[in-house]
């Protein structure tokens, strides 16, 4: 466990970076289901990282130190503000426990409540819940939870856990004054009036890595979702006719070309006599594509769902290949991919 005794802001920032790594990296002690998900930190509006000592004999008392940061409008993290934590509890508990805490502030109002007042009492108007664990972005608990504050705790000692209801985060004004060399309030630090100090760069590297992980995980999830949707869409496509027509008018025009061109289209011998020509009728027949079709052989007519195709020749069967024209291109297409207008 880390030292809960208050120290200077540089040491607190270094301690915070170490705690975050311990809470978020997979190790022999921390499996994938025992870490803070990247999206929880990446979407947080504020973050408090502390070490706390708790002692109990009839009445329990807790105290400790750490830092708090806020998310700025541009998505970056603010400079750190030094904080302490204090609280009392009832019940018969005997022992001493040192814990590391990560407190996630999910809403702007939680950050503002601390920044404007200098103190923040957990519980009451700000609901507190144990934060979700694991790497699964698709099970995004934080997006569904109404809790203003998530808490994460790691401890060694006689207590099984720690309750923060009624605990108070306290602004350490003197520590901030010494580090920033001026009298400054937490509000000015957390809302961007102070540039990020170089002494806390290690902490910012850890924090920025969560945004990168979240974006990468999001891209993977979107790719999997798109693949599933594409698979579903493909499963709904009707089968193409098993046999192709013997030649379309577009390919007839090419038959007067070189021998290589004729050989290329030998896979389309001449149209059979039962194919009905419709191009000379007074009212041209139009069909609307129900599905998208991407041709796989020369002479196929590509189209997207919703396109209106003028039919040049057709058969009496919808389970056949018809010939049509679309945007100046002529080719054949599966008739069961379209509907008559």
UniProtKB/Swiss-Prot annotation:
InterPro entries given in the database record: SH3-like_dom_sf, SH3_domain, SH3_domain_YSC84-like, SH3YL1_SH3, SYLF_SH3YL1-like, Ysc84_actin-binding
Regions of compositional bias (Polar residues) in chain numbering: 246-264
Keywords of this entry: SH3 domain
Biological process terms in GO annotation: regulation of ruffle assembly
Region of interest (Disordered), ranges: 221-265
UniProt GO cellular component terms: ruffle membrane
GO molecular function per UniProt: phosphatidylinositol binding
PROSITE patterns tied to this protein: SH3
Domain SH3: 282-341
Subunit: Interacts with SH3D19.
PANTHER family named among the record's database cross-references: SH3 DOMAIN-CONTAINING YSC84-LIKE PROTEIN 1, SH3YL1 PROTEIN
Similarity-based family: Belongs to the SH3YL1 family.
Protein name in the entry: SH3 domain-containing YSC84-like protein 1
Record organism: Bos taurus
Organismal lineage: Eukaryota, Metazoa, Chordata, Craniata, Vertebrata
């Amino acid at each position: 466990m880390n030292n809960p005794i208050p120290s200077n802001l540089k040491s607190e920032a270094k301690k915070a970076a170490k705690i975050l790594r311990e809470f978020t990296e997979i190790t022999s002690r921390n499996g994938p289901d025992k870490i803070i998900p990247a999206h929880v930190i990446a979407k947080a509006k504020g973050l408090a990282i502390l070490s706390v000592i708790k002692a109990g004999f009839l009445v329990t008392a807790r105290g400790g130190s750490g830092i708090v940061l806020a998310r700025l409008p541009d998505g970056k993290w603010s400079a750190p503000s030094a904080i302490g934590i204090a609280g009392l509890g009832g019940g018969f508990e005997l022992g001493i426990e040192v814990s590391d805490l990560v407190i996630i502030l999910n809403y702007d109002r939680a950050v503002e409540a601390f920044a404007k007042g200098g103190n923040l009492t957990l519980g009451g108007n700000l609901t507190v819940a144990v934060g979700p664990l694991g790497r699964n972005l698709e099970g995004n608990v934080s997006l569904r939870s109404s809790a203003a504050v998530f808490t994460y705790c790691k401890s060694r000692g006689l207590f099984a856990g720690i309750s923060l209801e009624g605990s108070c985060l306290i602004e350490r004004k003197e520590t901030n004054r010494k580090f920033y060399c001026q009298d400054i309030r937490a509000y000015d630090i957390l809302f961007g009036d102070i540039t990020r100090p170089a002494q806390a760069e290690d902490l910012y590297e850890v924090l920025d890595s969560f945004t990168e992980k979240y974006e990468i995980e999001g891209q993977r999830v979107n790719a999997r979702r798109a693949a599933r949707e594409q698979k579903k869409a493909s499963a709904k496509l009707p089968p193409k006719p098993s046999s192709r027509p013997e030649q379309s008018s577009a390919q007839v025009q090419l038959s007067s070309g070189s021998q290589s061109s004729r050989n290329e289209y030998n896979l389309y011998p001449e149209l059979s006599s039962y194919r009905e020509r419709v191009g000379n009728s007074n009212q041209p027949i139009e069909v609307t594509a129900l599905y998208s079709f991407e041709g796989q052989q020369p002479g196929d007519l590509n189209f997207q769902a919703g396109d209106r195709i003028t039919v040049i020749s057709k058969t009496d069967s919808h389970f056949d290949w018809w010939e049509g024209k679309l945007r100046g291109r002529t080719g054949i297409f599966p008739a069961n991919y379209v509907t008559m207008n």
